[in-house]
Design a protein with these regions (language model features):
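Acidic/histidine-enriched alpha-helical segments
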Residues: 1, 223-224
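Active-site beta-loop-alpha substructure in enzyme catalytic cores
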Residues: 210
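Catalytic beta-strand/loop cores that center a nucleophilic Ser/Cys/Thr
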Residues: 82-200, 215-223
Length: 224
């Protein structure tokens, strides 16, 4: 992977351990261009979509990170680096007694100097809540890797419906885990989906900056 890519973006999808290691089905499901379906496979094709990318695929990501590659995961996709041990002491959590219909809420940036936030003028900005594990539980060793947290409280709900907003106060939703695996590589994780259905335009730069500045870090902080 590293010979072809510096950065891999894993968009919102189910890549849990169970899904990744799932065996192919007895009956293949092709995704390929045919005379009937001429526009399939324009950006990729496979003779069988069933099953996960398996142990071989996991090992390929492991080698990618050990070689200094950067993995960016959003929403449910963060389960992949976390469940396979590529994210150090970062784990997912879903705060109790919170009900929300994807409202806009306030977030606070923990490190304004981080390249992910290039172009952001204020430390507090609006974000789309939901579409993932919602928050991260971060170990002491990675506290300084937290990039942003929820402000929390009903006053932080800018639009939409949300009960229990006080229960997300101070919870981390963006983390830069580096070095990520065996002292190498980088895993940038967003518990929300910064590119949800082309709606939350103000958050797109979180992903763009992560890609463009994959090998940069705040001044004085080393990157492998």
């Amino acid at each position: 992977l590293l010979s072809d890519y510096d950065v891999i973006l894993m968009a919102a999808q189910n890549v849990s351990r169970q899904r990744v290691l799932a065996e192919p089905a007895d009956r293949p499901e092709p995704y390929q261009q045919t005379e009937k379906y001429r526009y399939l496979g324009m950006y990729g094709s496979t003779p069988d979509m069933t099953g996960g990318f398996g142990k071989e695929g996991v090992e390929a990501f492991e080698t990618f990170l050990e070689g200094g590659g950067t993995l960016i995961a959003t929403a449910r996709a963060v389960s992949f680096p976390i469940e396979f041990g590529f994210a150090r002491t970062v784990y997912t959590e879903r705060p109790e007694n919170v009900r929300a219909q994807k409202p806009l809420v306030q977030a606070v940036i923990s490190d304004m100097d981080h390249p992910v936030f290039y172009g952001f003028a204020d430390s507090i900005y609006p974000m789309k809540y939901g579409q993932g594990p919602v928050a991260f539980r971060v170990g002491v060793a990675d506290e300084d890797r937290v990039l942003a947290r929820y402000v929390g409280g009903q006053e932080s709900v800018l639009s939409g419906l949300m009960d229990g907003a006080e229960n997300i106060a101070g919870r981390a939703f963006a983390v830069d885990s580096r070095p990520a695996h065996n002292g190498e590589g980088r895993v940038l994780m967003f518990a929300n989906n910064p590119m949800y259905r082309w709606q939350n335009h103000g958050e797109f730069n979180l992903v763009f900056n992560s890609i463009l500045n994959w090998n940069d870090a705040p001044e004085g902080k080393e990157v492998p």
